[in-house]
Regions:
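Metal-centered catalytic cores of metalloenzymes
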Residues: 1-131
């Protein structure tokens, strides 16, 4: 979990994982709790080299390989290599998960557990995010 302080309210952000899997942990996939817009999505961001802030941060829909740009999240993935690695990561089984879910299913479950207004069906197939 990541703890974010926003206007003196603490939020826990469920971390899905890093891109690529077993990487040096610079590109992170996570769920923002009680996220606005009523569009199920996950966040992807790259930490800056200095460790302070992010080089970019974007949101991607669960139901299609499209961005959900809203609020301060206006960036897009920087290149196709990152998109391919993201797609591959989400299709990979998380070996640290006791239930051995893919990162995709982990993301769906974390969205559903942390966003009550709209849920994602667990049988939703992962779109091709590699493009």
């Amino acid at each position: 979990m990541i703890i974010i302080e926003d206007d003196n309210i603490l939020y826990e952000e469920p971390r899905i994982g890093f891109v690529p899997v077993n990487s040096n942990k610079t590109i992170e996939v996570y769920i923002h709790p009680n996220d606005g817009g009523n569009v199920p999505h996950f966040h992807v961001r790259k930490y800056s080299a200095s460790g302070k802030g992010f080089e970019w941060e974007t949101c991607i829909r669960f139901d299609s390989a499209d961005y959900f740009l809203h609020g301060k999240y206006k960036d897009k993935l920087p290149n196709r290599k990152v998109a391919k690695e993201l797609d591959k990561m989400l299709r990979t089984i998380n070996t640290t998960d006791i239930r051995k879910r893919t990162y995709w299913l982990l993301a769906i479950d974390d969205w559903n557990a942390n966003n009550s207004s709209v849920t994602v069906d667990r049988t939703t197939e992962q779109p091709d995010y590699s493009q």
